[in-house]
Every structure is written in C-alpha cells, then in structure tokens.
Amino acid sequence: ELLANNKEAKDYINLKLTNAKVLYVNSYKGTVNTYVREGDTAIEMRTLGIDMPVNSIISGTVKVNLAYDAGIPYLSASKETNGENLKITESNEAAEPVIATVKDILDGKYTNDLIKIKEFTFSKEEYTTGKFNYYANDGENKIMIYDKFSGIGGVSKLTEGEKYTLTGIFGVIFRGIPEVLPIKAVE
C-alpha cells in the first residue's frame, strides 16, 4: 500500500503502486504536482519526469525520495527515478472526491487527496492592505482555501457569510493551518 511502511523522510524508496489513480496534475512555479490515490491513501509526486495524465491508473515500482513539507508528505525524483517499471493506463473515468468536513481536514485526514467539502461558510481576513486569506468555516472550525492552481477556484469573488461547496486537494499546511487547493470553481 502507498507509503504504508514509510512515515519519515527517506531517499531511494522502491515505491510499489497497485492500481493507483491520478487525481490531479498541475504545474506551479516550475514544479509539476501530480496527486495519486491508492486505496484510501494519497500522495503528491513532484516533478518525477514521468507522464502521468489525470485519471490514469498506475501499477508497478519506481524509486523516489520521500520528504515532508510542514507535515505533508510528497515524493520527488531520485537519481534512479524513471518509469521503466511502471504501467500507466490512460482512463476517461474521473476519480471521485472523498466527502470531507472542515473538522476532518483539521484532524489531518485525507492528506494529498481529492476531497469535497459541502455547505461550508466562506469568510476572509485581511492580513495586509488589500490582501486576504480565505477560509472555509463550519461554525466551530476553519481551514484556509488557497487558490494555488491558477486561481481556478474563483475564491476572491466569493461572498462572505454565504455557503459553498469546494472540490480540491488538501495539500498544504501554512503556518499551522491546513489549506485546501480548489481544482475547479467553488460552487
């Protein structure tokens, strides 16, 4: 299973994938972010140099490095990373998001996974003149919404106090606050 035996940063992991699904692919500041789910675990693969289209199914082995960024794991290329031992099968069947709550994300569930949070209340806080942090609230808890993927979520145009549904990746913790990255417009 994906990362079952690897909980700390480590180089040259021989990662075995069995029917792993590519959830989302994006390029951000020169880094290709590929999010993959196997079973109930997901991981970000950063710039491995292997073409893994969205919705593809991946099986096989690949040597990678495991690192952590603010508690969020990701895989990067090692000197031995290549796709020789991977079977990548393209698919038109889209991955289904995991239905999550704001509290689930605060509890660290669904890291690097495709999630959907329904009926959260939107709020924003100005941190410097004209610049805002955006939040999904459930009445007691809040997490940040960060439009990392080219502003696709349209978060800056949402109305404070209104209820929305968000589909995105829980892929960042910023200053101790979990962030969800929209992969499509917030509804």
Predicted feature descriptions by range:
Residues 1-61, 65-187:
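OB-fold nucleic-acid-binding modules
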